[in-house]
Amino acid sequence: MTPQALAERSREMDGLSFIRALLEGELPPPPIAQLLGFRPVEAAPGRAVFELVPGEQHYNPIGSVHGGVAATLLDSAMGCAVQTTLPAGTGYTTLELKVNFVRGLTAQSGPVRCEGEVVHRGRTVATAEGRIWEQDTGKLVAHATTTCLILAPR
């Protein structure tokens, strides 16, 4: 399925059904998830959870996972949490993303879990929070907030 066809399917389904279809493998992962290697593991109204195993392919020049990987993971989890609240035909886009990094990641960190949760969902704007934890230690890696614009059907 092409990325454009996947986007079209997302508009045909309500957001929760779409995220669950990704989670259950009924739809292919979006290109960014394939590129970075993260996957959805939970979805509920107002909530989305992803997992990633950090590897050397994610490294920056100083030998740790690039902050953009964590930021992308957080943006994805929080955005998908917002998406789970949307009816068919309604989309969203990130207006603002604020990430706080509290510890670095390396390939030795082991798998991480990223949870996104909606704080507020209005008619035109939604806000959400996200956190990344090391699965093995439970240590917080980063936390974030986002503001998303709700895109009404055309």
Indicate where each model-derived feature is located:
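Terminal targeting signals and extreme-terminal segments of soluble enzymes
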Residues: 1-154
